[in-house]
């Protein structure tokens, strides 16, 4: 998808056949024809989130053609958590940010990420042989994707019975939360294409994994600041595995 005008700088190639460019205070996420529906979903969620108390990117324009689509959004001030060094203050700020998203009124959110739909997405990825091993844990890489999916299916009834529905980010990784590098106050949230009502543990599992993988720290301080006294280890493991099977 060709962007209008000049001066666009490539920032990154995304996980879902998208590319991100920047020109000044404007970001443009582009995709080919096959990615239009997914990018449109992100646009709609970003527009909804902008109507809430959660800070994030504002949708500036939407361009669609036979070549694909482009979503133009405002830059969010601050630095991603992934680009900042670990500190107790930053972990506490991250917990407050995730909690703020989760405290948005469920009844006002028009988007859902029902477990059965996410499992169906994982089934499609496994069926196509498209599981990305980069998203799997070291132990999971040693197991056939079909067996991993079978484990998800077996655990699904118990997780469904225990789920706590909140507005979830859907991809609650460190690069998607930005903070003031001096005060470490939360400045905004980006990449909300998977936002929707879901079990809060679908976000908590990703945050826990990121803290351990990127900062090599225990997630206990995060859970304490978030307000979970005894995290459910089985639900954390379930959602981490399920998420890994949906990227492909």
Residue ranges and their predicted role:
Residues 234-248:
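Short, basic/aromatic-enriched C-terminal tail that caps enzymatic domains
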Residues 63, 81-147, 151, 157, ...:
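A cross-family kinase active-site recognition segment
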Residues 1-8:
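Juxta-kinase regulatory segment immediately upstream of eukaryotic protein kinase catalytic domains
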Residues 36, 164-167, 180-238:
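Active-site Asp-x-Gly
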Residues 12, 16-24, 59, 150-202:
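Active-site acidic catalytic loop and adjacent metal/ATP-binding pocket
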Residues 5, 54, 162-163:
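Short coil/loop residues immediately preceding or within conserved phosphate-binding loops
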Residues 40-43, 92-96, 150-153, 205, ...:
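Generic alpha-helical structural signal
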Residues 12-114, 125:
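ATP-binding pocket architecture of kinase catalytic cores
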């Amino acid at each position: 998808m060709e962007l209008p005008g000049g001066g666009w700088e490539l920032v990154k190639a995304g996980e879902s056949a998208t590319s991100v460019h920047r020109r000044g205070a404007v970001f443009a996420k582009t995709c080919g024809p096959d990615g239009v529906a997914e990018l449109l979903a992100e646009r709609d969620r970003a527009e909804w989130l902008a109507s809430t108390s959660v800070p994030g990117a504002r949708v500036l324009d939407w361009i669609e053609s036979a070549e694909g689509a482009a979503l133009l959004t405002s830059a969010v001030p601050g630095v991603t958590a992934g680009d900042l060094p670990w500190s107790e203050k930053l972990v506490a700020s991250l917990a407050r940010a995730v909690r703020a998203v989760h405290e948005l009124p469920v009844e006002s959110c028009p988007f859902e990420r029902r477990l059965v739909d996410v499992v169906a997405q994982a089934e499609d990825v496994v069926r196509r042989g498209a599981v990305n091993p980069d998203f799997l844990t070291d132990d999971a890489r040693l197991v056939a994707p079909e067996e991993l999916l079978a484990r998800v299916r077996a655990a699904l009834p118990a997780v469904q019975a225990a789920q706590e529905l909140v507005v979830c980010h859907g991809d609650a990784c460190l690069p998607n939360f930005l903070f003031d590098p001096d005060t470490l106050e939360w400045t905004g949230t980006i990449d909300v294409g998977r936002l929707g009502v879901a079990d809060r543990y679908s976000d908590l599992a990703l945050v826990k994994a990121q803290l351990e993988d990127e900062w090599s720290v225990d997630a206990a301080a995060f859970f304490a600041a978030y307000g979970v006294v005894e995290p459910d280890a089985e639900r954390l493991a379930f959602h981490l595995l399920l998420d890994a099977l949906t990227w492909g």
